Amino acid sequence: MMDFIRGKGGLVAHLGTSDAREVEKRIADGDERAKLVYDGMLYSAARAISGLAAGADGQVDRVILTGGMAHSRYVVDYLTRKVSFIAPVEVMAGEFELEALAAGACRVLEGKEQMKVFDSYGANA
């Protein structure tokens, strides 16, 4: 179970790799199992995005796809088909989490934005 938790689940468990580029190459080469597993993973991501929209009472201005996998046309096209009914989909490929946190801290320190405090459930306190 610990192996599963520590990165041996998901794509690795099903396809022996965590490299999305390799999985997409296998799909392009006709590997139906790779397509089934990858599409299943993306379907789960689309469901999660939809669930977050429901939690926001549908008040969503944009769905923003970030992270390394947002460089993939396959991923972006799949997720856009599934979630664009919620709001326009925007792609900001790459991993910008630390930059976003730093920029937010600067806005608070400069008095441009109020600091937000979240409780242990992630709700704005």
What is the predicted role of each segment?
Residues 78-87, 112-114:
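A glycine- and small-aliphatic-rich helix-loop capping segment at beta-alpha/alpha-beta transitions
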Residues 56-63, 85-88:
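Short, surface-exposed connector motifs at secondary-structure boundaries
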Residues 70, 90-125:
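Glycine-rich phosphate-binding/hydrolytic loop that grips phosphoryl groups
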Residues 45, 63, 105:
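Hydrophobic, well-ordered secondary-structure elements that form the walls
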Residues 11-14, 67-71, 98:
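Short, small-residue-enriched loops and turns at beta-alpha junctions
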Residues 3, 7-58:
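Adenine-nucleotide phosphate-binding core of ATP-dependent small-molecule kinases
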Residues 60-79:
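Glycine-rich phosphate-binding loops at beta-strand->alpha-helix junctions
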Residues 5, 27, 64-68, 93:
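Active-site proximal loops enriched in glycine and acidic residues that flank catalytic Cys/His/Asp
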